[in-house]
């Protein structure tokens, strides 16, 4: 998908969100950071698709002496690991500064940053980005899940019974097909 097909770019401070959402905290405490990261990414893949967001989840190098890396999960979501000694905050601030300079806004794209870090909030808003706290993002994700589930239920109810192609035809076509089968 091209940038213009997305309504917004969502930058997520991964560890900040994990530290705030109770389900992710429990997963982190029971199974480790990797499990919590996986759950967050899975959750945001669906959310990004439902909202037509291009999402970048940013994780600190977390004491790992590794170079910066990116893992692309879908066309709408990628995970960015910062370089050693680079924080997610720094990565997000640099992205916001570049975003403001390059004027992605001309393409009517919004930039949203999800973090509960107050200093980060003030910085990104200063660059013209929108801000979502971790609890606000959790609510937005919950609303998107409910909407998706209700759409799925409506589609399931509207499906014709049976597994035959005949059942998918409109009544006039079914009548004509019956006549053809009977040789009329």
Q: Where are the regions a protein language model picked out?
A:
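Nuclease catalytic cores that cleave nucleic-acid phosphodiester bonds
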Residues: 2-5, 9, 16-184
